[in-house]
């Protein structure tokens, strides 16, 4: 009876946390936005303290100008910081924070490709992917703890089954959602850059360059939190042809 009541409680909590993303996908999000935004703010402040901030006026102006265009229709103000880091990377955090590595600025061929990167990262924020990811992690960890406490598997078979549940939670629940989030951010990013006046077809060139930069060294896609670059390129080509 207790097990049934707990499962009903878990089920009702899951239903109340369901929302819809900007692309129409159902999401599981139950953490308060204020809490997630504070986490993003704290993380960004830490990065600014620990990483060297670029003084290159050209880099800063380019990143700021493109970011401003991408988020022009979004509410609130956005902070953009260029970090001295040779790795080709960029990110956006809850609380409207955007970070761009100098390595990304040297990799892209033009402002449209940089707009594709920033649009993608802003897409993560608009779709509340950080909240979704944190909610998933919390739900899985709490749910597994409750199931373990209720079931109390003592046999070797029971322990093995629970171990498999852990593997399933790792690669069957959490990992795939990350790939879905990345693909969704791609879709949102292309829409943002197109609305801002940039050429969305340049997103294809961007990921071709990213694939060349990776020199073919990628994890197997099934165990990766990001789609393979070749998969991304195919998706962009399909979206840009519509």
Give, region by region, the residue ranges found by the protein language model.
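N-terminal secretory signal peptides that target proteins for export/translocation
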Residues: 1-2
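A Zn2+-metalloprotease active-site environment signal
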Residues: 5-6, 18-242
């Amino acid at each position: 009876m207790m097990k049934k009541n707990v499962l009903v409680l878990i089920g009702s909590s899951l239903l109340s946390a369901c929302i819809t993303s900007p692309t129409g996908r159902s999401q599981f999000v139950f953490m308060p936005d204020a809490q997630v935004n504070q986490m993003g703010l704290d993380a960004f402040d830490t990065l600014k303290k620990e990483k060297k901030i670029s003084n290159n006026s050209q880099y800063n102006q380019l990143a700021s100008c493109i970011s401003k265009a991408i988020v022009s229709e979004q509410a609130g103000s956005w902070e953009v910081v260029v970090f001295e880091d040779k790795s080709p990377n960029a990110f956006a955090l809850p609380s409207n924070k955007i970070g761009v590595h100098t390595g990304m600025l040297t990799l892209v061929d033009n402002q449209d490709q940089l707009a594709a990167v920033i649009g993608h990262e802003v897409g993560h924020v608009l779709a509340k992917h950080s909240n979704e990811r944190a909610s998933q992690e919390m739900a899985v960890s709490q749910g597994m703890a409750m199931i373990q406490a209720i079931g109390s598997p003592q046999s070797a078979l029971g322990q093995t089954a629970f171990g498999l549940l852990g593997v399933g939670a790792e690669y069957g629940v959490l990992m795939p959602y990350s790939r879905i989030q990345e693909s969704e951010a791609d879709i949102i990013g292309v829409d943002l850059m197109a609305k801002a006046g940039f050429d969305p077809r340049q997103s294809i060139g961007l990921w071709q360059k990213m694939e060349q930069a990776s020199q073919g060294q990628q994890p197997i896609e099934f165990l990766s939190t990001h789609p393979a670059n070749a998969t991304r390129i195919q998706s962009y080509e399909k979206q840009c042809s519509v």
